[in-house]
UniProtKB/Swiss-Prot annotation:
Short name of one Pfam family: Phe_hydrox_dim
Protein name: FAD-dependent monooxygenase hkm7
Function: FAD-dependent monooxygenase; part of the gene cluster that mediates the biosynthesis of hancockiamides, an unusual new family of N-cinnamoylated piperazines. The NRPS hkm10 and the NmrA-like reductase hkm9 are proposed to convert two molecules of L-Phe to the intermediary piperazine called xenocockiamide A. Xenocockiamide A is then converted to hancockiamide D via a series of hydroxylations and O-methylations.
GO molecular function, one term: FAD binding
The organism's place on the tree of life at top rank: Eukaryota
Pathway(s) per entry: Secondary metabolite biosynthesis
InterPro entries named among the record's database cross-references: FAD-bd, FAD/NAD-bd_sf, Phe_hydrox_C_dim_dom, PHOX_C_sf, RIFMO-like, Thioredoxin-like_sf
Keyword Mitochondrion listed: no
Listed EC numbers: 1.-.-.-
Enzyme class: oxidoreductase
Residues bound to FAD: R191, I192, Y193, D261
Similarity-based family: Belongs to the PheA/TfdB FAD monooxygenase family.
Keywords, alphabetical: FAD, Flavoprotein, Monooxygenase, Oxidoreductase
Amino acid sequence: MEIFESFGIEGEVTKQWEPATDEILWCRNESGTLSRMERFRNEPPVGVKWTHGTLQQGRVEEIMKKRITEISGVEVEYSTELSDLTINTRESSNSKASACSVTIRSVADDQEAHRSSETIRARYIIGADGGRSSIRDLMGVAMEGTKGTAIWGVMDILGGSDFPDFGATSVVRSDSDGAVDFVRREEGLTRIYVELNKCAAGWEALERDTITPELILEKCRYIIRPYKLEVDYVEWWSSFTVWQRLSKSMIVHDRVFLVGDAVHTHSPLCGMGMNTGIQDSFNLGWKLAGVVQGQLNYDILQTYETERRPVAEALLDTDRTVLDLFHAPLGPEAEALLAKVPALQVYLGGRGICYHESVLTCRLAQTLGDLTAGECLPDVTVFDYATGRPSSTHSWIKGNGGWAIIVWAGDVSRPSQMNLVQSLSRDMIELRDSLGKSGSMIDFFLIHCSAWPSVELADFPPLFFPTTKTIGRPNGRIFVDEKAVYDGLHISRAEGGVAIVRPDKHIAWAGGLQEVDSLQRYLRQVFRPQPE
């Protein structure tokens, strides 16, 4: 959702989605009784606006495509397939060379002989073509992992049930019968996942090619007995066997980048695939755009794999834990797994990601309260010092590759503190100007915690005004903390500090107002100076 907010589509997503507020576990005990065991509140952690929600992937794609066209005029072209991909390795060390050659052909015409083909030269290729990725195969990148034995059926239905928690996200599991997962969907739909080939007589030898919608519903009704399930309409159904696999690499010859299911495959039970794929793509996208436009140094592209591979590994670990929740026998093992659910909720929300030390993440710098390099910036509300309007920190960072430097100025009613802010601002103006056009990608914001009457807007440095006018100059970059944000984030009101925030809202560097040398070193190793 934080990524969607960057592109201004979060409102359209939340307008269509079904909020997922509670998660409920039912179990059948040894005596055969089915009963509710646990109920988990799915509340957003501190610094997060949204709880979880469910929305069909096709709808998300339509929202994204519409926004892409609005922003750039670019439209997604379908009915094509990749037939060849080569990399000129002699040119791959030249970052400006179009070292990739791709041949695509139209598949709109069923007649093979009539299919037209086209060869495209490109500097970079992104393989976002799914679990059966042609790009991955053509590059000879292997997938490593295991295939499970459980066969699952999945359906989107309109219907009703006397099962008490049919209206919530619910898991029904039995050591002997298998499991069912009910997930509420948009417009009254319910997604049903049903474990088909576990234990119950006659189901163990089930083959995927024999599965039908009627068979999935039969097994679902068997697992939730004595409760009934009535189905009015089946919108979609399928079946799957879980593969948990990870590609051996995510970057080939520094030119081909794999994202999403082309890198990691797992069960669809928690809806993590699309979310993680979008995060992969956004992580890569702003880096690639910055390099192509000459704003960022070329070596930052390597951080795509160093940052996202650990996330992919954690994704597979999480998937194993979720599957274990369905299969662990009642007792201590199941209780230990249930204790992991709160942490799983944080991870599934995408907020548990912390990137390690790299050219893009300076974790060795002095920390700033709870703001730690590598973690996502908390989304907190502060107030425009000129208008008093509330503003969220995440709303400042748009999906245009822009960076933010947030100066936590502390109590600037103290002259010594304001002097520190003035000195830092002069250094930042000098650095920004030395970067030329690349410096325009950095926006500066200030949050102080002084009382309203104690400081005038004109007392603040010109760095935080988006115009050079000195009379009637508009604001929009200077904010005041009225809701104990400093205290909540454990930032010193007396000392303040600085946080550099990347385009993906992860903190790149955090330290004190006087850590100017470290801050400048970081920016110079990331940004590439460009003449105006």
